[in-house]
Structures are given as structure tokens and as C-alpha cells.
Design a protein with these regions (language model features):
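Amphipathic alpha-helical coiled-coil/heptad-repeat segments
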Residues: 1-189
Length: 189
């Protein structure tokens, strides 16, 4: 508002303000929002030891990939064995006269099994990548939390981005600040 004069200020408002139903959430100035974020981050800093313990246990138990890696290796071995069976069936068909209907039936089964293994391999790979990505995000959160000063005054943009996942303003004038470790802090306007 007042974009070209000395009274300029940034106001945050709901993105659904002009839809069919008018949104009842309050407008916030940059200063109000920053104050509530600093307050929430101070509460997080005060409870740092507990948050670090919880987040590290989550990181190791939920985002661990060793069991998935073992299963992925087994699926890779099964894929190689299944590919060899397919190649053997093709070579046998080329060198030995046999009933083609029976051969086609056998090839369908072998191919279906191979495709199922490929799908499982793909699913495991995606799950491992997702867990690794979430683990890396949690590691960044933990590093940034350890760097957070005892008294939070004015956090920089990188700290805000790494620590905060989402900020929700409700119609009852409460602000829910969700940190990347799942912790939520509720502030009042």
C-alpha cells in the first residue's frame, strides 16, 4: 500500500480474498508477522535441546534407508535372474522346435514377473530418494537450529527458509507457525 511514497508498507492478506466467499482472516503488516515469527523462533530456541533430541530420533528411525537398500539389492538380483530366464527362453525357442502357444504363455508369465520386479525397483528407488531428501532437509533444519542464538532478534531470510515450513493465519486471529521438524507454535495477534 502507498507503493510510491514514504508511507509505503507491506501487507499480507489471504490469496482467496476475492473469491466467491470472502475470507475472514485479518490483514497483517510485515512488522506484525516478523514479530510473531521472532517470538515463535525464540520459543523454539528455548526448547532447543528437546527439539534436537526428538528430531534426531525421527531422522534415524523414520528416514533410515538401510532396510530399503537391502530390499533394492535383492530386487536387482531378482531382475538379473529374471532377465536371464527370459533370454534363455528366447534362445531355446530359436534353437529347439516347440509348441508356440505354450512358448507364448511362458513368455507372458516371465515378462509379467519381470515388469512387476521393475515396478518394485522403481518404487523402492523413489522411496529411497524421498527419504534421503527429507533426511537432508531435516539435517539442514538441525544445523540451522544449532546455529540459532540464545536470544532471537532478527533472523535472516536463509534461517527463516530453513526453519519454517508454513505460516497459517486463522480467522480467529491466531497464527500457526509450523517448523520443518513438525513442531507447531501458535501465536495470537
Amino acid at each position: 500500500w502507498h507503493s510510491n511514497d514514504r508511507y509505503r508498507r507491506t501487507v499480507w492478506q489471504c490469496t482467496r480474498k476475492y473469491h466467491d466467499e470472502i475470507c475472514r482472516t485479518p490483514h497483517l503488516t510485515e512488522a506484525q508477522l516478523r514479530g510473531k515469527v521472532v517470538s515463535a523462533m525464540q520459543r523454539l530456541s528455548d526448547d532447543r535441546a528437546s527439539v534436537l533430541r526428538t528430531a534426531e530420533s525421527i531422522r534415524d528411525s523414520v528416514y533410515g534407508t538401510s532396510a530399503l537398500q537391502d530390499e533394492l539389492e535383492q530386487v536387482q538380483r531378482d531382475l538379473a535372474a529374471q532377465a536371464e530366464k527370459l533370454n534363455r527362453a528366447i534362445r531355446t525357442n530359436a534353437s529347439v522346435a516347440q509348441d508356440q502357444a505354450e512358448h507364448q504363455q511362458k513368455m507372458k508369465k516371465l515378462t509379467a514377473r519381470y515388469q512387476a520386479l521393475q515396478e518394485r525397483y522403481q518404487a523402492l528407488t523413489e522411496e529411497i530418494q524421498g527419504r534421503d531428501s527429507r533426511r537432508a532437509g531435516l539435517n539442514s533444519f538441525l544445523r540451522q537450529l544449532k546455529k540459532l542464538p540464545e536470544t532471537v532478534t532478527a533472523p535472516d531470510a536463509i534461517t527463516l527458509h530453513v526453519l519454517i515450513e508454513r505460516i497459517t493465519v486463522n480467522a480467529d486471529r491466531s497464527i500457526v507457525i509450523r517448523f520443518r521438524d513438525g513442531t507447531e507454535v501458535v501465536e495470537r495477534l
